[in-house]
Every structure is written in structure tokens, then in C-alpha cells.
Amino acid sequence: MASVQKDPILQVETTCGSLLFELQIIWDEVGETETDRDQMLLELERECLEVYRRKVDQANRCRAQLRQAIADAEAQLAAICSAMGERPVHIRQSDQSVGSLKQELGRILPELEEMQKRKVERRNQFIVVMEQIDSITNDIKGQGELVHSEPLIDETNLSMRKLEELHCQLQVLQKEKIDRVETIRKHLCTLYSHCSVLGMDFNEVVGQVNPTLSDPEGPRSLSDHTIEKLGAAVQKLMEVKIQRMQRLQDLATTMLELWNLMDTPIEEQQEYQHITCNIAASEHEITEANSLSEDFIKYVEAEVVRLDEVKASKMKELVLKKRSELEEICRKTHLLPVSDSAIDQTIVAIESGIVDATMVLEHLEQHISKIKEEALSRKEILERVEKWLSACDEESWLEEYNRDDNRYNAGRGAHLTLKRAEKARNLVTKLPGMVEALASKTIVWEQENGIEFLYDGIRLLSMLEEYNILRQEREEEHRRQRDQKKLQGQLIAEQEALYGSKPSPSKPLGGKKAPRMSTGGASNRRLSLGAAMHQTPKPNKKADHRHNDGALSNGRRGLDIAGLPSRKQSMNPSEMLQSPLVRKPFSPISTTVVASKANIATTTTQQLPKNNAVNEISSFATPIKNNNILRNLEEEKMMTMMMQTPKNVAAMIPIPSTPATVSVPMHTAPTPFTNNARLMSEKPEVVEYSFEERRLAFMLQSECRLV
């Protein structure tokens, strides 16, 4: 009974039977039909089959998984053994009793774990060796620590044979690294020696080759490029050392020669004994620090330069003395001396040793003797030239003297000036003959010597020819001025014949002479055109203000600058209406009167004295009959001009004639008070001109002066 209870299948069957019996009882009570009962029983059987089928499938899958795990473990174990180059440790025997799948898997897994541990250890050995190989390779290639990636390992080949090959490769690289380190060390030692002798900074030189070499504790580049640059730096410093050694030996040789030449004392030579002792030394024998540095060579060069200066100082003094002698001779004979730049270049060449000073001195002696011979042949002509130049100076002084209007004024030393002027006139009369004689002498000299006679670098004949041309031009100018004065005299005579002679200026109306304002003779001469001035009454403040405003107008200022007369405004407006001769703008004007008036104005302006500060106020009258005749002539002339072509009209436009009495703007002084009736009787009649007419008159008047 106990065995039955222990059997689970029997227990299940018993349980199922009891449950089925209990189900029958329930169906009986319910009253289920047999068909329904059979159908329900079929469903129960079907459900039981499904449960069994699921359980069977699950068991099959578990068996397949165990078999796959065993196969995978065996494959991994075989791959590891193959990669490590060892014989597989798990080989299934066909005659061997096979246990369950779980037992077989349990036997394989420990072996697999053991082989995996061995593979990891072998792989780590490969990594260590390959990292060392990569490090040395990077040092040789000059990459240093730039590459930090893990080395690539072939997982399929981790055999001991491969590991031994890597160890051999590592040993070869280590040996090459040692050789490169030794080569770099030798180069660095050589560089240090050269830098010490040449006075250079070792770290700076090495840093230019490769910055890693200047750090003694850090890693250094062992690449071929670094070694090549080190070798090039060593070679370059060797060449610099040889060049400086040759320079120093040349300086020492020159120093010995200068010492022997100038008998330098032994005490002074002892200071540079360590330099002269290496005069025949080779490159390897010079090892003293800074013995070939730039500062030391400059120090020796400075001493050699000082000795050269001492040597050349006396030669320079001789050359300068000869040059001064040559310049003095050339100055006295009016010859062009040797240029200072050429002498300076010669002195520099002597100081540098390019030219022998003895040869230069001989050349200067020959040149001085040649200049002296030429000076003897030029002596007579030079004396005549000095006389001619002195006469030219007197001629210039005489011209200035003749242009002085005050030359005849009595004063201190006037009689001496007159005597000098008389002597100058006598000397000027001899100038043409003097120039002709000098030119003939010069031509003869040039024919005899075959060269041009130069006076301070200019040919003397050219100077004489230029002087003759200038003299002729001055004579023509004087002749033209005399003709112009003669013509002006004729015009004045015609004016006097037409208008009569100019009356003397009227005296001031008052008993007291009016004070004159000093405004400058040049301004008054410009404003005065030969017409008489009228006296103005003393204005009040209000009228004076109006007068000043009118004087500042643009039209009046333009006429004042042009030198033409402007209309004087009256103080009383009624006086303007009483003037019967006020002319409308652009009315006909007489050409003959205009020309005569312009000539009179020019002559009067030229004859005014320089010391006259203000023109006196005066007036003169012209008969009215003459004005009527002039008006008729002007109308006829204007009709003739209108018949001409436009091209000829501009040439025939007459200058506006100046009326008989014209008021010219000028600075006037106040006069004593007079009554208005007297002023009305004495006030001149004014003819009004437009601005265009006055400007045209000024232009034509300027053309007449030029002619």
C-alpha cells in the first residue's frame, strides 16, 4: 500500500478515477444525457493530450539545447587549442560509454574555462611584446607618444612560435634604438663643443633641430630625420667655426703686420697674445670657450680698425693738405676743382686699403703742377675778366641810380654819389670795347690750347655773348621808353590844344589851410587821372554816415581799384536835380576826347612825385560850348560804329570821355564852413557813367598804356 502511494502515476490515476466517479455522480444528479457525457469526456481527453504534447515538446527543446551547448563548447575548445598550437584535450571515444547530455556538458565546461584562461594569459604576453615593439618603432619613426591605440593582435595565432618571433623582433629594435641613442649623444656632444667655442646657446641650437632633444629627462626623438638634422647642424657649425677661425687668423696676421709697421711696443702686444698664438692652429686645436664668438671677433676687428686708422691718419692728413692746396689754386684761377666726393672716396679707399696712399699723393702732385701751368696761361685773361665784372657792377649801380627820382636831392654824401655816377658813366662807355678785346683774347687762347676757356665752370665766350644780348635788350627798352615819352608829350600837346593848358590848383576857400591826410602816394596816384579836384564842405554826422555807406558799395570799390573816376554824391539832394549835364547810361561819347583824356591821365600819374602823400583839392572849368560840340561828335561816331560789323565794333568802342570837371574819390580833410550858395556856384558839373562804360574805358586805357 505504501508503494502504491509512493508511485506518482498510480496516485494520478487514482485521483483521476475518483474525480471521474465524482463527475458521474454530478451528471446523474443533473441529468446529463449520454451524448453530452461522451462529448465532455472527449474534451477532457483532448485537453489531456494537449498537455502531454506540450510537455514532450519542451523536453525535446531542452535536449536540443544541451546538445548545442556541448557542440559549442567542443568547438570553442578546439579553436582555442588550435590558436595556441596545442592538441585538443577533449576527444570523444566511440567505444566509451556515453552518459547523459548534462554529464557530458559538465565534463567539457571546466576544460573550456581552463583553456580560456590560458588564452588570456598568452594574449597578454603578446600585448606586452607588441607594445614594446610599437614604442620603439614610434621613437625610430619620430612619432613619440602620439600613438596611444592598443596594438592589433591576431586572435587566430597565439602560438609560442609567434611569440618567440615577436621577441626576436623586439630585440632587434632595442639594439637599433641603442645605436641611435649613441649616435645622437655623439652629435649632441659635438654640438655642445662647437656652441661653446662659437659662443652660441646650446639649448637654442638643439631646440631648432628637435624640441625633445633639449629635455635631458624626457623622451627623445630617435628618427632618421632628427639624426639627419643633427648631422646637418654639426656640419653647419663646423663650417661657421672654420670661417670664423679664418677671419680671426686674417685679423691676427693684419695685426702683426701693423705692429711691425708702426713698431708697437711689446706691452701693447701682450694683450692680444692669445689671438696671435692661434695664427697657424687647425680647427681641432681651437677648443677654448668663446674663442670664436662674434663678440670676440668684433673686439679683434675693432683693434685692427683702430690700428688702420692710426696708419691712415697721417696719409689722410697729407691727402687733405694736397686737396686744400689744389682747391686754393683752382679758386684763384676760377677753375672747377676736383669734386669733394671723389676726394672723399679716395680717402675712404686709402683707409680701407684698396688704394695705395702713395699713388694717390703722386697723382695729386701731378694734378697740382698741371693746374699751376694752366693758371699762368690764364692770368692775363683773368685780369681782364675781373675788370669787366667790376665795370658790370658799376653799370648795374648806375642803372639803379638813374631810376632813383631823389638822386638830385641835397643830402649828406650827395657829392660823392655824383662823382661815383660820373666815373661809372665813363666806365660804362668803355664796356663794349672791353668786351670785344676780352672775347678776342679768349678766342686766341682757346685756339692755342685746344680747349674752352671756362670761368667757374661756364664758358667765358658764352658769358660775353649773353652780356651783349642783355645789353642790346636794355638799349631797346631805353629806346622804347624814350619813344613812349615823346608820344606822351605829343598827346599832352594835343590835349592842351583842344582843352587849353591845365590851370593851377585853386587855393582853399578858408583862410586856414586844411590838414592833409597821409594815405600813401601810390594810392592817390592811382585814383588821380589828371582831373582837378573840388573842395567838399564839412559834412555833418548824418551826411558823413551816408557818405561812408556809399563808399563801401561794390560798384564804387570796383571803380576805385580800376583807377577810374567815380561820381561824387552830393550832400544836398536838390543839387543832384540842378545838374544839367547828368548823362544817361550808354549815351554817345567822343572817341578823340576819350583818347586824349586817357593819355593825360597816364602822363599825370607818371609825373607825380613819390613823396607826395595826398593830392591837393583843385578844380578847373571847361566851357559848355565845347561840351555841345563833343556831344555832336560822339553821336556821329556812335552812328558810324553801329554801321560796322560786330567784329570791328569791339575795336571801335571809344573810351568814355572824362568830362570837363570830374569828382574823384579820395581821402579829404575837413575844410572851413562855407554857405550853401557859394558851394552851389563852385560845385563842378558831373556826368554820370555806368559801371560797364567805366570798365570798358579802363580796359582800353590799359591797352593804350601797353602800346
Swiss-Prot record:
Positions where Phosphoserine occurs in the chain: S504, S528
Disordered: annotated segments: 495-574
Site (Microtubule binding): A410, A421
Spans through the membrane: none
InterPro entries cross-referenced by the UniProt entry: MAP65_Ase1_PRC1
Subcellular location: Nucleus; Cytoplasm; Cytoplasm, Cytoskeleton, Phragmoplast
Protein source organism: Arabidopsis thaliana
UniProt GO BP: cytokinesis by cell plate formation; formation of syncytium involving giant cell for nutrient acquisition; microtubule cytoskeleton organization; microtubule polymerization; nuclear division; response to nematode
Bias (Low complexity) ranges: 500-512
Quaternary data: Forms a dimer. Binds to microtubules (MT) during cell division. Bundles polymerized MT via the formation of 25-nm crossbridges with centrally located endocytic MT, and midline phragmoplast MT.
Gene ablation phenotype (knockout): Irregular root expansion. Defects in karyokinesis and cytokinesis. Cytokinesis defects before the embryo dermatogen stage and in roots. Embryos with enlarged nuclei, often containing multiple nucleoli. Some abnormal stomata with pores attached to a single side of the mother cell. Long root hairs. In roots, multinucleated cells, cell wall stubs, and synchronized cell divisions in incompletely separated cells. Normal anaphase spindle, but distorted phragmoplast. Abnormal formation of nematode-mediated giant cells leading to impaired maturation of nematode larvae.
Nucleus among keywords: yes
Residues forming coiled coils: 49-84, 157-179, 269-289, 354-374, 464-486
Effect ascribed to mutating A421V: In ple-4; impaired microtubule binding
One Gene Ontology term of the molecular function aspect: microtubule binding
One Pfam family of this chain: MAP65_ASE1
Role this protein plays: Microtubule-associated protein that plays a critical role in organizing the mitotic microtubule array during both early and late mitosis in all plant organs. Essential for the cytokinesis, especially in roots, by maintaining the integrity of the overlapped microtubules in the phragmoplast. Required during root morphogenesis. Needed for giant cell development during root knot nematode infection, where cytokinesis is initiated but not completed.
Keywords: Cell cycle, Cell division, Coiled coil, Cytoplasm, Cytoskeleton, Microtubule, Mitosis, Nucleus, Phosphoprotein
Gene Ontology cellular component annotations, sorted alphabetically: cortical microtubule; microtubule; nucleus; phragmoplast; preprophase band
Tissue occurrence: Expressed in all tissues enriched in dividing cells, such as the root and shoot apical meristem, foliar primordia, and young leaves, and embryos.
Name of the molecule in the record: 65-kDa microtubule-associated protein 3
Similarity section: Belongs to the MAP65/ASE1 family.
